[in-house]
Regions:
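Short amphipathic alpha-helical coiled-coil/interface segments
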Residues: 50, 93-105
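Conserved polymerase palm-domain catalytic core
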Residues: 1
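Extended C-terminal regions of large enzymes
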Residues: 83, 96, 100, 109-148
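Basic, alpha-helical interaction scaffolds
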Residues: 5-91, 108-111, 139-148
């Protein structure tokens, strides 16, 4: 793209601003945002988080309870941060969490094809109290809307 923009910092030094195409996402406050509203870069970033978590769980020497605890209280909340601004479909959420969920279930000595009713069911009905990220995304959007 022709031309460049510069910005002075508080010491007076000039810095050239990076120019991106409208479809390119740039990380802003931990979330990849593109000017045209596409979320391909953000989706890939979230998938990378899932793959990284799966790799760490797979090679760790943790117990089955610690693996499930880490998935529930560390990995899922790290995804929850961007839910109020993301607009992923249910299939996209499945592709994001699939590697992490599979590795966690394997480490917890459970079959990877365990029914979602058990995973996302409450402990009152012998479920694991995990939250479906697609449903959580909708709740986060509603909560943000109600705060506005």
């Amino acid at each position: 793209m022709p031309g460049s923009f510069t910005l002075n910092d508080k010491e007076g030094s000039q810095h050239t601003l990076r120019r991106l195409e409208p479809s390119q996402g740039s990380e802003t406050l931990g979330i990849y945002l593109a000017m045209d509203g596409s979320h391909a870069d953000h989706l890939q970033s979230m998938k990378d988080k899932g793959i990284a978590f799966a790799g760490k769980i797979r090679v760790s020497n943790c117990s089955s309870n610690v693996a499930m605890y880490t998935y529930k209280y560390c990995f899922l909340p790290s995804l929850q941060y961007s839910m109020c601004v993301s607009n992923f479909t249910e299939k996209e959420w499945i592709s994001i969490i699939a590697p992490a969920k599979k590795a966690t279930l394997h480490k917890s000595q459970m079959v990877a094809t365990i029914p979602c009713d058990m995973l996302y069911g409450t402990s009152k009905y012998n479920g694991f109290d995990l939250e479906d990220p697609y449903t959580r995304q909708g709740i986060e959007k509603l909560a943000t809307f109600m705060q506005e």
